């Protein structure tokens, strides 16, 4: 039986755990850091079958996972911990020879684990080099994962795709370049990667609820023309952009010619059912097969019910391709759709 260490957004681990229980017959699920990390087993499902199934249809709230190949008591002693990490790394053998290896070290708050992520990484990297591997930060063939709780140390090695994310704990980090107007921009950047949907493949986007322009700025940077709809002002840096048209009206008040856009994005904080009504009414302004990236606000802490209701409502006009709680989501999830 294989055990996996898993991560969800803070406060959403109970929902990720429930997804796992529903998906995996016979699984055993146990919490680690309250509300954020937990373990589960493959239960009655063969490991390769399970991984293939989870990759094909990712759970909404499970952000990251890795197989636990060794579990040991955590120690606050640097020498003891370093010895344990090096001993595990020595077991990797042929797996890492001539391979690019990312080493990701995380710890729960208040864990006695004595190293920061860089120090822990260095202990393992030394052995990886001795085995003929190349430690890297990105584009790895293998990922060595280390996660320390208050009592236990979990370590394992797996491919990036089997982790569901190649970022530590499934938490991508983007540089806040000068062109990034708001933190909301990171949400769209993460969606682009999570959905494997290069934004520069589109030509004209409709951004509903665009102010102050976080998502609009990303789309403009990718070379798109953008029609931004919001009664509020956009960031001054965007006002004179030649590919931006800003319509200062509510999204419910606008209309366009059919097929005007090949991408719709919407990050409005309104009631999600009201947002759905607006987006569905605007479906005809999208070309056939156009994509939409839409934030779904989770109301009243009933995420499964909210997602079920909203995907049904959007399903009248759109094919639902993926729903995922991104690292940059809070009380919400992000959905990728295609116009029918």
Predicted regions: what they are:
Residues 1-340:
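SAM-dependent transferase fold signal centered on methyltransferase-like domains
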């Amino acid at each position: 039986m294989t055990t996996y260490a898993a991560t969800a957004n803070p406060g959403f681990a109970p929902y990720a755990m429930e997804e796992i229980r529903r998906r995996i017959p016979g699984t055993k699920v146990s919490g680690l850091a309250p509300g954020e990390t937990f373990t589960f087993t493959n239960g009655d499902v063969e490991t390769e079958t399970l991984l293939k199934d989870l990759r094909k249809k990712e759970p909404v709230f499970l952000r990251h996972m890795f197989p636990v190949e060794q579990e040991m008591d955590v120690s606050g002693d640097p020498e003891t911990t370093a010895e344990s990490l090096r001993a595990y790394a020595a077991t990797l053998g042929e797996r890492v020879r001539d391979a690019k290896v990312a080493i990701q070290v995380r710890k729960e708050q208040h864990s006695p684990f004595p190293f920061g992520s860089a120090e822990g990484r260095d202990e393992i990297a030394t052995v990886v080099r001795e085995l003929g591997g190349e430690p890297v930060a990105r584009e790895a063939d293998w990922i060595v994962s280390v996660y320390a709780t208050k009592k236990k140390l979990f370590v394992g090695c797996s491919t990036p795709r089997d982790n569901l994310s190649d970022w530590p704990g499934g938490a991508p980090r983007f540089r806040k370049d000068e062109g990034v107007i708001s933190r909301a921009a990171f949400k769209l950047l993460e969606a682009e990667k999570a959905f494997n949907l290069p934004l520069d493949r589109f030509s004209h986007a409709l951004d509903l609820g665009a102010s102050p322009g976080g998502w609009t700025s990303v789309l403009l940077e990718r070379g798109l023309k953008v029609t931004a709809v919001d009664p509020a002002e956009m960031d001054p840096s965007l006002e004179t952009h030649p590919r931006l048209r800003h319509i200062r009206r509510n999204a419910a008040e606008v209309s366009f010619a059919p097929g005007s856009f090949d991408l719709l994005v919407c990050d409005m904080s309104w009631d999600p059912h009201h947002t759905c009504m607006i987006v569905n009414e605007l479906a005809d302004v999208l070309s056939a097969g156009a994509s939409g990236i839409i934030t779904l606000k989770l109301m009243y802490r009933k995420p499964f019910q909210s997602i079920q209701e909203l995907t049904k409502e959007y399903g009248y006009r759109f094919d639902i391709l993926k729903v995922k709680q991104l690292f940059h989501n809070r009380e919400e999830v992000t959905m990728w759709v295609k116009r029918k």
